[in-house]
């Protein structure tokens, strides 16, 4: 073999060795990148797990340390009917009692909502049921809000389940006056106060007159009043007074009871959004403030299980009856809202389980106005 051939062989070995080294270096680089990525993922997961443990710990502490109005339900009396319900979706009946007395949990349910918590999708959906809705209550045609006053939370839940084919087995009753302190804790809620709402909130006076009325019931001498109409931050007492307005239209044009429930949903959505972004360390104080004004069948373990979805979830809302679904006809119920209950049931289930807004569902399925009262 000549000198030139040996040189070529040496060069080939060098090229091979160099390629091998580069390949090893590339593998090492990829390994290091994977290692760094894995470390980042592990770190993030550790933080999230730690956060969840911290939140759960604070909730356990708060719910054990502070008394709350826990009640037990007889599930045989609730009429739960939905066979195709999903394990990761929890439906809860929410009843709002607007008595002006912050400590009362009795009376007509001024607002009725179905709160659906999807722990998998991390969504919370609210469906408001108008209190003047004509339904069957204990076998008789009546307004839906009569169920709570005549048979308590069990009859009210049964009425929702039987008329809208649902699987509700838990509830929470909230005294809306008790929301005042919670709203103040989160720094208030943003709302747009129209000129009519500001100057002529009721037949008897302005929004500030409503605020003064609420303050008098609470023993407050100098409540903070609203200075002018427009978009602004409302304090707790201002927001609760604003949510009670029925006479005037909202900024979106909704009137009467439609407007009132729209304001209530807005206040609840704002409160939820601000509470969800609140520092975890403030949770015990927030819960302590909330619990005296809530009566619920949920145990503290169930509340803790739902907490992650509430903390990181998004909130969407709809209202029953949906626009243009009312039926003209005699119901025997004065000033009742008469609509097809089967169609309303499908609207609700499409929203909760399929993620379809009412607008989307109606576009795909023509409105059914078939009367059901003979």
Predicted regions and their residues:
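Entry/capping segment at the start of metal-dependent catalytic domains
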Residues: 2-6, 11-14, 27-122, 244-245, ...
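C-terminal solvent-exposed extensions
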Residues: 82, 102, 133-142, 281, ...
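Extracytoplasmic
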Residues: 87-90, 107-112, 121-129, 139, ...
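Structured segments of extracytoplasmic/periplasmic soluble domains
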Residues: 95, 101, 132, 159-167, ...
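Second-shell loop/turn segments in exported
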Residues: 101-104, 142-150, 165-170, 229-230, ...
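Flexible, polar/acidic helix-loop-strand segments at domain edges
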Residues: 105, 184-279
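Extracytoplasmic/secreted envelope proteins and their assembly/folding machinery
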Residues: 109-111, 141, 153-161, 176-180, ...
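Amphipathic, coiled-coil-like alpha-helical scaffolding segments used for oligomerization/assembly
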Residues: 150-218, 297-299, 318
